[in-house]
Swiss-Prot record:
SUPFAM superfamilies: LeuD/IlvD-like. InterPro entries: 3-IsopropMal_deHydase_ssu, Aconitase/3IPM_dehydase_swvl, AconitaseA/IPMdHydase_ssu_swvl, IPMI_Swivel, LeuD. Gene3D superfamilies: Aconitase, domain 4. Catalyzes the isomerization between 2-isopropylmalate and 3-isopropylmalate, via the formation of 2-isopropylmaleate. The gene is leuD. One of its GO terms (molecular function) is 3-isopropylmalate dehydratase activity. NCBIfam families: leuD, PRK01641.1. One of its GO terms (biological process) is L-leucine biosynthetic process. This is 3-isopropylmalate dehydratase small subunit. The keyword Ligase does not apply.
């Protein structure tokens, strides 16, 4: 996982509430055996017409938003079935953070495990962020737990252990390996006849 301390980037807003994991990444893409290469499948049913061509009315197809790294969205983002692939698609598109009113709990955890920072902000803040032009930038300061845009700033909460994972770039296994010596000593203690 990449470290995340302070990120500055542009936004892309899909302000729908109740976006589920099947809308994020349809089931036909779950057969892939790799953890990378899902960017073209993100919001597949909304991004493409039935003939496979781009839907010009969908914001992910807006040429001015192709470098957006912060997704602004509605309430209950990522509800539905457990689908880690959906977070891989967000990450592969280039999103470093998703700002929503609330998250499906499984998607929230999958974000924290895959380096996409999930941030919950109130509707008024998200509405302000959703109106930004393609070139206006937003800064996310994780150490201060703030989202900053021009003269606006909003505080967000995050569990201290998840915050540490982002700040250090460590995943669950990396954090466990910090205790390798203690784990080995404990294993010797409980199995002295090895």
């Amino acid at each position: 996982m990449d470290k995340f301390t302070v990120h500055t980037g542009t936004t892309l807003a899909i302000m729908n509430d109740n976006i589920d994991t099947d809308q994020l990444l349809p089931k036909q893409f779950l057969k892939r055996l790799t953890k990378k290469g899902y960017e073209d499948a993100l919001f597949f049913e909304w991004r493409y017409k039935e003939d496979g061509s781009n839907n010009p009315d969908f914001i992910l197809n807006d040429p001015e938003r192709q470098d957006a790294s912060i997704l602004i969205t509605g309430d209950s983002f990522g509800i539905g079935s457990s689908r880690e692939h959906a977070v891989w698609a967000l990450r592969d598109w280039g999103f470093k953070a998703v700002i929503a009113g609330s998250f499906g709990p499984i998607l929230y955890m999958n974000c924290t495990k895959n380096g996409v920072l999930p941030i919950e902000l109130p509707k008024e803040a998200r509405e302000t962020l959703s109106k930004l032009t393609p070139t206006e930038q937003v800064t996310i300061d994780l150490p201060k737990q703030e989202v900053i845009c021009g003269e606006h700033s909003w505080h967000f909460d995050i569990n201290s252990s998840w915050k540490e994972k982002f700040l250090t770039g460590e995943d669950d296994i990396d954090q466990t390996m910090r205790y390798k010596d203690q784990i080995s000593a404990y294993e010797v203690q409980i199995s002295p006849y090895q």
